Structures are given as C-alpha cells and as structure tokens.
Amino acid sequence: MVCEGKRLASCPCFFLLTAKFYWILTMMQRTHSQEYAHSIRVDGDIILGGLFPVHAKGERGVPCGELKKEKGIHRLEAMLYAIDQINKDPDLLSNITLGVRILDTCSRDTYALEQSLTFVQALIEKDASDVKCANGDPPIFTKPDKISGVIGAAASSVSIMVANILRLFKIPQISYASTAPELSDNTRYDFFSRVVPPDSYQAQAMVDIVTALGWNYVSTLASEGNYGESGVEAFTQISREIGGVCIAQSQKIPREPRPGEFEKIIKRLLETPNARAVIMFANEDDIRRILEAAKKLNQSGHFLWIGSDSWGSKIAPVYQQEEIAEGAVTILPKRASIDGFDRYFRSRTLANNRRNVWFAEFWEENFGCKLGSHGKRNSHIKKCTGLERIARDSSYEQEGKVQFVIDAVYSMAYALHNMHKERCPGYIGLCPRMVTIDGKELLGYIRAVNFNGSAGTPVTFNENGDAPGRYDIFQYQINNKSTEYKIIGHWTNQLHLKVEDMQWANREHTHPASVCSLPCKPGERKKTVKGVPCCWHCERCEGYNYQVDELSCELCPLDQRPNINRTGCQRIPIIKLEWHSPWAVVPVFIAILGIIATTFVIVTFVRYNDTPIVRASGRELSYVLLTGIFLCYSITFLMIAAPDTIICSFRRIFLGLGMCFSYAALLTKTNRIHRIFEQGKKSVTAPKFISPASQLVITFSLISVQLLGVFVWFVVDPPHTIIDYGEQRTLDPENARGVLKCDISDLSLICSLGYSILLMVTCTVYAIKTRGVPETFNEAKPIGFTMYTTCIIWLAFIPIFFGTAQSAEKMYIQTTTLTVSMSLSASVSLGMLYMPKVYIIIFHPEQNVQKRKRSFKAVVTAATMQSKLIQKGNDRPNGEVKSELCESLETNTSSTKTTYISYSNHSI
C-alpha cells in the first residue's frame, strides 16, 4: 500500500535521518519474506546485529557482486557458531538466549550504511498521527528487532561509515577485521571497539623489525586509499617519534595505475640505492605487480621487502616471483585455527542450515552445481544432489578472521553476562532492568571484559577500544627449490625476533644493510648531515677525548686516558723512578762511591785526629763539612726512593741541609781567613770569634736558618705525595703516565736550595778576596778552586733542570740532574779539600809533622809584608810572593793562641 508521511518525531540524528525517511518507511512496509530476503534472523531474548561482506562489490548500478565464500560465508557462520555455543553454555548468560540479525554489506560502505539503518529502527520514535494510507486507514508498522550491539564490519571504510550512525543511537559495535588507525579516535568513534589490533600496532611492529635489523634508511610504498596511506602514515609518525629511522622516499600506487607505472616506481626507489628496505602497505594485486616490475628491471636481491598483513603468508602475490620476493619479511595478526568451528562448518548441509539465507548460493559456488529453482540455469553445470560434503567433495581451509569473529561475539556475550550479574543479581532470565539495555552502560562492560578467547589468548580492550597487538612475523624463504613462509618471530607489544633463523638472497644468514651511512668505528662520532639525521660522516675522537655516544666526544678526566678503542676512559698508569732505571743507576753509583770515599776520609781523620795535618785543617769545621758532604751523597737515595709521607719529609729536611752544612763550614773558614788578614793589616790585635768554638757557633747559626725555613715549610704545607698527571701528559695518550712524587714544586725546590746557594755564592766571594794569601797560610786557595768548580756545576744545573719542564722525561732528567749535581759538588769539596791531606797522612806520614809554631803576631807580620810585596808580586807570574817571607818571621813565645803550620798544607 502507499502511504504519505508528513512528520517524523525527534531523534538524536534528525538531520541525518530525514534523508532516509522514505527509505525506512518503505522497508517497514515489506512483507516478512521481503523484509529478510537479504538478512539472517535468529530470534532471542537479546538480539545482536552482524555485518559481513557476503558479496563483493557489484558493477556500476548493481550494489552486490559475486559471493565471497571465505570472507563472507565463513565469517558469518563463525558468528552463528559462536551464538550456538553461548546459548548452550549454562555458565554464560544462563536462561538468556542470544539472537542475531545478520546483514550483507556487499563490501561497499554506502550500501552498508543503508543496511545498518535496520539496526536503529526500533530506537526511532514514530508519530503516525499524520500518516494515512490511500484508503484512509492508519499504517501498520512491523515491529523491528531491537539491536543491543553489532558485530562488524570487516573493511575499515565500512566500519567508519556504520560507526557514525551507531554512535548516535548509542549502539556498541565490535569489529573483527577493521584495522584503520583512525578508528582508535575515541572522541569520534566512542562506541567502536575491535578484537583485532589497529594498523598503528602493525606499524609499530614494522618499526621494531627495522630497528632490530639495524636498518635506519628505508622507503615506503602504499596503495592509494585508507589502508595503505594510513599504514604508511602511522609507520612514518612512529619512526619519527622514536627516532633512528629515516624515510628516504614515500611512493604511492594509484588506484588506477597507468601502463609502466610500476616500473617507474621501482626506478624511483632505485634513486636512493642505500635505502634497500621497502615498507609496503599495499593490496595483494599491487604487491604482485610491484614484484613483477622489480623482476623485469633485474633487481633480484636488491630490495628488502617488509610487507603488512595484506601480504601476510599469501601465495598469490609471490607466485612466479619467488626469487624477487626471497627474504621478504611479512607480518600477520596472530591467529589460530578453531577446531570446533571446522567440525561445525564441515557438518553444515542444506538440510541443517536453513537459517543461512545465502548458504544455498554458497553450496552452488562451492561444489560447482545448481539447486533447482535456486540453482544457476546454465545447462552445462551439474545438478546438486544435497549429498555433497564440505572438505570431502571440495577444498576447505578455515578463513583467517574466524577466530576474531568468535572472539567479538564472546566479548559481547561476556559484557552482557557481567551486566546481568550486576543489574539482575539472582534473577533467572532477563530482569525488567535489562529489557531495555543502555548502550553506553553496555559499552563500559565491553571495555572491561577480560577472558581467554577461542585460540586461548586473552581478549581485552584498551581505553580506545583496541585489542592488544599480537602478530606473527614471517619470512619468505627458498630452500632446495621449495618455498615457504617461515615464522621467525612474533610481536606482542614488544618484538621477539629469531634473527638466526632469517635467510636472505643466496642463502646468506647475515642480514644485509639498509643504511644511509655505515656505522662509525669505535672511537668515532657521527657528524650528521643537516636535515638527514640518518646520514653522517665519521670523525675520530682525538687526543684525550673518548666517544660518549654516537654524536659526541668528551675529554677524559685528568687521571684517565681513552681506552684502546676510545669508547671509554681508563686509569693512567702510575710510575716512579725505579732503582733499576738507567736514570737512577748512575747517580746511585756516584753516591755510593762518594759515601765510601767520605767515610774513608772521616775514618782517617778520626784515626789521625791529633796529627798536625788534621789539627791544622780545623778539625771541628772539617767534621761539619764532611757531614755535609756525606748528606749531599745520601740525598740521592731519598730522591730515588718510592715517595710517601716519611720520604717526602726527609727530602724536605735533607735536600738543602747537606749543602748548607758544607757551605756554612766553608763560609766560616773563608770568613775567618779574610778577617784575620784584614785585621793584621790594621793592628796586632786578633779578630773576634776565631776560636774553634766560635766557628762552630757561627756555622750552626747559619745552618739553623735552613732548619727554621724547613720548619716553616712543614707548618704551611705539610708534606704529602701527589700523582702528577700533567708531567707526562704526552700528545699520544698511550704514552701518558701519572708520576708519583712528593708535592714539592720547582719554586719550593729553589727556595729550599736558595739559602745554600746564597752561602755558596758568599763563600765564593770570600774565596776570591783571600786568593792572595801567602802559601804558608793558604787553605783559601783550595777552597776557592772548590767554589769556582761548584759554581760552574750549578750554573750548568739550572738550564738543564728548568729546560726540561715540558719534556716527557722531566721527572727522570730533573731527579738525575739534581742528585748528580749535588754529588759532584760534594765530590769537588771532598777531592780538593781532603784527598790531598789523606794522601799525605797515608802515603807520606813523614810530612805529617809539626814544622813550626806560630803566633798571631807572626800572622800579622806576614799579612803586613804580604800587603807591601803585593805590588811586586804583580810583576811576577801569577802574583807569587817569595817563600822567604815566611823565613823572616820570628817565633813569639807569648801566651797568645798559636797556630800549627805545615809547609805542605797551610791552614788557619
């Protein structure tokens, strides 16, 4: 009958439903058979909707095309199977029967939108007061099924279209195959959930694979459309966020490619030859044609394909392209074959499966026969007997999404079960509170479900309604002319990849590279190319720098140097002057000889202490001088010994003390001679402080100044050891060494020796002043020669010591120079002042006798005559004065102090 509608009551999407108003009314006026001609209806207490691509897209003007046996029939039968299992389960929705209303989307989003309006009919309030039929009777409306939730759809484009309608009526939707990332937008698709992971997870898995294989320079290839472009976009975004992967170029395959288009794409990919890895989000046909083009251009083994789930483990894309596809890594959502469904589906016949309105069509397609009035009218097709059996008389393999269809139905069932437990506690069947199910409330229960699915894996949803990502990773391998997709790993929020099981072209197990630049060697940093972070030049970390990370070098701490590969720092070896070193052997040898000689002289002097020569040399000051000489030799051992606090303390004390002893004694001697002869020129009165006791007091007073300075040094800067890393910090870190030494700077050393050098210089001045003393009284001349030689030694010491401050051998040179200089100074004093005396004492004892006893008056007379004859002496060689000067002196027997004079070795 014909009816004219004037008004439709208000609803949440009035502006949208107005356009469909007449279509809905037409649908509602159909007879029962007409209404369900393209749907499956199973009655129940709670009705679930289902959307499946039973047919493919039709040609222009025709909404539906050929039957899709696997993606259509297998999947909708999986929903019916799940409904049967739930209704038989006494522990799940007990005494509540689930019914279904399954529609065909015909793989077209617009057609699916029209079909899905059936699900919202019961939620649209109708005002029929102004609606009249042609005969004036009120219209009769068929009561539509009230849909509580929808299972589907398959294609993302269909799910997007349907989700926009269902959300307006608050009908929860669970998809079993839609993977578009945009469906994760909970603000736009808040009532949409899915038991399959979104392509963003797949993209994440592919990024992880690329990273695990060390590929940082890749190209992307997408089929034009939502699936390909969204997948590549997700891959690009994730790779940009985590860093480390650069996109060399992104190519798109047009929906309607021109001839030669695929060859052009391959040539463009070859423009960046280092980007061998190609990320593919493309449909099956595009994958096949890309492989054909690569084969045509003879690029076997060059490209490293990373395929999405549209490639998966399919044979069709690689058929007759095996060599070009070898090594391809593909990804596929983890799934399992459900044995219970296999038994169920194989048992389906025309007799026991009348609820499936498309099963007769499937039967004809599957067995290649015709069914009477429903059969195909082609005469050459055999007639169906009805005795055919699935898997026996036809090939059968469970479709890959069957598991997810079952899990989607069970997710809805568990949500309803939990809702019933809370809203109808203890109530058998539906309670009044669940007669009308609040879709928003049901959505909350759906998002909260957590159960083991049909394959034994957990089924859960996140806050966006997405299922966790679980993927199997395959590699296409060729072994002994046989091919296979071998599982090489899996991905469940993180990658587990068996790299050792991977095989590449030419049966190699070492995975090839897809990088813009080769990795830098250890100890080299990356200097990235501007704008291309995956391309770089390698620069070596020089000097004492080590590689901190890929991009930077840093200076090692002062006490460390780079290790052999410059990836870290290691302690610099600590060295000290060893006893066996040539730098130590020479000064030690000299010191030992000097100590032996000094000891021999001391023993000789002690043994012959009362002989004229020993007495005439000034015994008291001689022993002080010999002590200083002994200390000068001994300091060598302290300077070479391993430094510690005690050794450093002794070094400070004895470093200048030996020289101070020596030169204080010599200075006192030369000063005494000078004062005596100067006084003798003026008067016959003896100068003050020329007695032995006075001489000792003067000497030790001079020495005490040195000791006082050392004491102040101890207080201001207590002795301790240091490790000097700057002394031997060579240009080559391998030769760098830390020097263990006492904390005595060059300045401190000069200050310590400075006082002794001052005494030495003063003594030299007095030696020069007394150089003209008559030979009878002249011990001043040997002292003078001693001081001249000593000055030369120390003048040579200064440039050698300070000129090696920047040398890597500084410690050795300075220590050896200092110890040898002190030993040579001591040797000069010992050799010139005491060896002649010892020689006479040992080998010429007849000369070690008292010749004359002279008074100070004799000295005065000698001094006076010496001053008178000095000018005459200037006319003689070397200013010598005749020895008869001494013979004219008369003996004075007064009580004044006398001096013993040896004509061979005079001393005062």
Curated annotation (Swiss-Prot):
Binding residue positions for L-glutamate: 156, 177-179, 227, 309, 401
Glycan-linked positions: 95, 298, 452, 480, 565
Residues joined by cross-link Glycyl lysine isopeptide (Lys-Gly) (interchain with G-Cter in SUMO1): 882
Gene Ontology terms, MF aspect: G protein-coupled receptor activity; glutamate receptor activity; group III metabotropic glutamate receptor activity
TM ranges: 584-608, 621-641, 648-668, 696-716, 747-768, 782-803, 819-843
Tissues and organs where the protein is expressed, per its UniProt entry: Prominent expression in olfactory bulb, pontine gray, lateral reticular nucleus of the thalamus, and piriform cortex. Less abundant expression incerebral cortex, hippocampus, cerebellum, and mammillary body.
GO BP: adenylate cyclase-inhibiting G protein-coupled glutamate receptor signaling pathway; adenylate cyclase-inhibiting G protein-coupled receptor signaling pathway; chemical synaptic transmission; detection of mechanical stimulus involved in sensory perception of pain; G protein-coupled glutamate receptor signaling pathway; presynaptic modulation of chemical synaptic transmission; regulation of neurotransmitter secretion; regulation of synaptic transmission, glutamatergic
Bilayer topology term: Multi-pass membrane protein
Assembly with partners or alone: Interacts with PICK1.
Entry function: G-protein coupled receptor for glutamate. Ligand binding causes a conformation change that triggers signaling via guanine nucleotide-binding proteins (G proteins) and modulates the activity of down-stream effectors. Signaling inhibits adenylate cyclase activity.
UniProt record similarity statement: Belongs to the G-protein coupled receptor 3 family.
Protein name per the record: Metabotropic glutamate receptor 8
The organism of origin for this protein: Rattus norvegicus
